[in-house]
Amino acid sequence: ARPCAAQWVRTSGGGPGVVRASQGGSGAQARSVQEGAPADVVTLGLAYDIDMLAAVGLLPANWQGLLPHNSTPFTSTIVFLVRKGNPKGIHDWPDLVRDGVQVITPNPKTSGGARWNYLAAWGWALRQPGATPDTARAYLRSLFAHVPVLDTGARGATNSFVQRGTGDVLLAWEDEALMAARDIGPDQFDMVVPPLTILAEPPVAVVERNAKAHGTLDLARAYLDFLFTDAGQRIGAKHYFRPVTPSILAENRATFADTATFDIASLGGWTQVQKTHFADGGVFDGIYAR
């Protein structure tokens, strides 16, 4: 968000002199806004968190239809970050449950990013020949049996893998994996894109109640509109997010590997997914009873 905000300020022709930003986990940020943090816009990891803000009247219930592409200016995918040279030969989801493979992923009860990881695995399992919800549960149960430590958030999981050297593979957003493999540790890590994964759609929205109170509604809308311009799309691509504008994505085809994806709607949408999988007594609780 910060690079986009900086460029927007420079090019907005008399716009605000400063954009204040707060960064953190999607759910924690949503709760902060719900409890009174004066955000004019939110850019979060999953639509469910913005739905929670709509549920208390901070923005319209139809917020996702107010901007293009379901209010998602960039997308990502869930990929595998492995040790340099991929010594465990991890290429696809079945490889994660082989003997001797340790998988690092956070707790999907506490981490929005971990929910994308979990749902990528669940959706893959459901799409296998002869698959049923029971076979998908069995795969997820086996997968989490290979997780040696369940961090509460994505940053903690990344630290476990990158800094503490725990595990053989980190389930991560593509942008984070590309940053690690190209910028942070090109001699330490490789990125593997599985043949089938989930389309992660991190949405944006104007918090209309706050923006109206601050007199910044037009500015807030203009900033989010900027994210969908060619300039905004190129900034996203520079930071390893997949642009939604086809021509800008084509400019960056060398960065982003081809892969088949499925979206959250194909799994029932966030409200249903949250209730089925991550609520107390849901599927995750059933497979991770330790």
Region spans (language model):
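Solvent-exposed, polar/charged alpha-helical surfaces in well-ordered, non-transmembrane soluble domains
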Residues: R2-A6, R31, E35, D51, ...
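Periplasmic-binding protein-like
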Residues: S71-F80, R137-F144, D151-T152, I184-L217
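Short beta-strand->loop
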Residues: V82-K84, D99-P129, F144-V147, V193-P194
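Ligand-binding pocket segment of bilobal, Venus flytrap-like solute-binding proteins
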Residues: Q128-P195
